[in-house]
């Protein structure tokens, strides 16, 4: 098989979903550049013209008329070179991926074939791979992957798998921006590049940024982009996701409830890098349960970041609401009903007051949207308040475990531009909701979740395939290999649980939480950025009460019968 030699331009586009004119004009500009550089071929990513998630447009004729109008403009621009782009096709009231290839204004592709022959350039064919197509061994001189791959912190990019299977020259053309799925969003990672036959794949375009590059295949490729450290890449994915989603919605201002805790601190750091200081508003909303330590952390961060900052105590609002609550009697005929006030009710009232009342009102005056600061460790078990701290326009950090948030914030503290904005006390103060005396950080009290242990356990519940269930975890506990399986320090389980009874109670409690009301909370929470293959929103789930199996009950009784 001969080496394919041609001058090619690959374009890594920021594709705006549904904005056909904007996408097409960008493509036409790149085609014009390719002609000026005497390129033989210009290639665009999957769904380059329309964007991907356009379900609302499925039955709107004007959308498809607009697409056809600009498609013809692209065809007219294919004189003197070949243009290949990914597009959408409607079949049986569903979208499916397709591509178009035009040379000198003539169609050289067919809807039912993934192969293209370019007259005058190749003595064989080009194999086109669309999203979800498996790479196959063929006699093609060149394979092109038209992609829309998202960044995932737990999996490798598609070009790595492709590169191991494809023996021809190989081009990977990805896009940047976001895919908005409603309950979650994905950040498209870019990293478009090329592999000459028998060489390694070379990323020629960066993560998350739009761009294009021209080169002659079979010759020495341009210098690859420098590799990015894992933590830096994670931070960039968060920043670009926030930036692109705000742009997607036509928004420019954000409010953050800055409690002085680790989660709101990370959100603040991210948005401070996305927005100008005048478009970021931070609000500290203390009650009598908030310590001077966390209030001081919030004030220090706001001062260093130099954005809008205000303190709005909620104690009087809570007191007024509780007085009205206590003085209200509900009647039916001659009966009276007085509703009890539990500690949990008062805790949730504080969270809802902060978000649904104060931040929502301030957002209207500021003309901005509320950032949700929830993390995956809390979301999985419903440790948050519905219509309270789970509300917002986007949960940027929603697919990060608590330990990952600590690790990322520690990394950011080494950055010169953020070093002074991240107080040391964030790492020494116990993570706490500060909603009651039981959350007093000055006494070392805090959340009921032991993150160094539970993060690993919860991750096995939802991210491992197959999932770890209580039966599996209990078997590992009985065999003494739970720590090894969850990659925990030896002795961690015995440190947290003094008896099998304590271990089993904890295991069952969190498993019930995961499968119960927390599912309803997740469905009604802010959309979350997906950074993994098993993020919430991607996982289809419903509320199914946990009924222990016979095997679980038998093993549990065996363990408990041996005594403490």
Q: Which residues fall in each region the model found?
A:
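Active-site-adjacent "lid"/gating segments
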Residues: 2-4, 179-253, 270, 279
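N-terminal glycine-/serine-/threonine-rich phosphate-binding loop
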Residues: 2-41, 240
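Active-site beta-strand/loop signature of hydrolases that rely on acidic residues for catalysis
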Residues: 23, 34-57, 84, 140-149, ...
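Active-site beta-loop-alpha substructure in enzyme catalytic cores
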Residues: 29-44, 114-167
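Glycine/threonine-rich flexible loop motifs
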Residues: 53-59, 149-158, 181-183, 346, ...
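Short secondary-structure boundary/capping segments
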Residues: 56-61, 98, 158-161, 187-191, ...
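Catalytic-core segment of enzymes that process non-peptidic bonds
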Residues: 62-132, 160-213, 346
């Amino acid at each position: 098989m001969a080496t394919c030699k041609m001058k090619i331009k690959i374009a890594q586009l920021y594709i705006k979903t549904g904005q056909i004119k904007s996408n097409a004009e960008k493509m036409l500009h790149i085609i014009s550049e390719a002609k000026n550089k005497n390129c033989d071929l210009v290639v665009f990513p999957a769904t380059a013209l329309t964007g991907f998630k356009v379900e609302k447009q499925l039955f709107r004729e004007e959308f498809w008329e607009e697409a056809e109008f600009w498609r013809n403009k692209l065809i007219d621009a294919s004189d003197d070179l070949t243009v290949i782009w990914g597009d959408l096709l409607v079949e049986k009231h569903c979208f499916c991926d397709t591509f178009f290839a035009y040379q000198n204004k003539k169609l050289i592709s067919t809807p039912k074939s993934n192969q293209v022959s370019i007259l005058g350039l190749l003595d064989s064919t080009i194999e086109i791979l669309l999203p979800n197509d498996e790479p196959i061994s063929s006699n093609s001189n060149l394979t092109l992957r038209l992609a829309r791959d998202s960044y995932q912190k737990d999996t490798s990019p598609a070009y790595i798998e492709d590169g191991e299977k494809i023996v021809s020259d190989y081009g990977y053309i990805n896009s940047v921006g976001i895919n908005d799925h409603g309950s979650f969003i994905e950040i498209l990672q870019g990293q478009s590049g090329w592999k000459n036959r028998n060489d390694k794949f070379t990323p020629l375009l960066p993560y998350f940024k739009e761009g294009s590059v021209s080169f002659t295949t079979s010759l020495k490729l341009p210098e690859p982009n420098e590799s990015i450290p894992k933590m830096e890449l994670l931070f960039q994915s968060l920043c670009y996701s926030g930036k692109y989603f705000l742009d997607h919605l036509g928004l420019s201002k954000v409010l953050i409830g800055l409690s002085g805790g680790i989660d709101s601190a990370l959100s603040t750091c991210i948005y401070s890098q996305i927005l100008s200081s005048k478009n970021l508003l931070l609000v500290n909303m203390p009650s009598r349960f908030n310590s001077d330590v966390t209030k001081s952390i919030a004030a220090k961060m706001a001062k260093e970041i130099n954005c809008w900052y205000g303190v709005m105590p909620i104690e009087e609002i809570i007191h007024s609401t509780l007085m009205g609550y206590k003085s209200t009697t509900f009647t039916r005929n001659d009966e009276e009903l007085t509703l009890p006030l539990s500690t949990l009710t008062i805790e949730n009232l504080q969270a809802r007051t902060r978000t649904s009342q104060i931040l929502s009102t301030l957002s209207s005056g500021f003309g901005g949207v509320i950032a949700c600061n929830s993390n995956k460790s809390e979301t999985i078990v419903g440790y948050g308040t519905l219509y309270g701290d789970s509300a917002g326009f986007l949960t940027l950090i929603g697919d990060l475990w608590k330990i990952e948030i600590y690790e990322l914030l520690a990394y950011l503290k080494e950055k010169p531009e953020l070093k002074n904005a991240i107080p040391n006390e964030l790492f020494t103060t116990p993570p706490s909701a500060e909603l009651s005396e039981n959350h007093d950080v000055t006494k070392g009290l805090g959340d009921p979740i032991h993150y160094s242990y539970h993060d690993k356990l919860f991750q096995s519940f939802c991210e491992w395939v197959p999932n770890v269930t209580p039966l599996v975890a209990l078997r590992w506990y009985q065999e003494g290999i739970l720590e090894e399986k969850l990659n925990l320090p030896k002795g961690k389980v015995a440190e947290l649980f003094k008896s099998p009874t304590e271990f089993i109670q904890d295991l069952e409690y969190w498993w019930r939480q995961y499968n119960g009301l927390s599912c309803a909370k997740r469905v009604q929470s802010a959309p979350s950025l997906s950074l993994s293959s098993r993020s919430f929103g991607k996982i289809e789930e419903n509320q199914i009460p946990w009924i222990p199996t016979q095997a679980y009950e038998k093993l549990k009784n065996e363990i408990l019968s041996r005594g403490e």
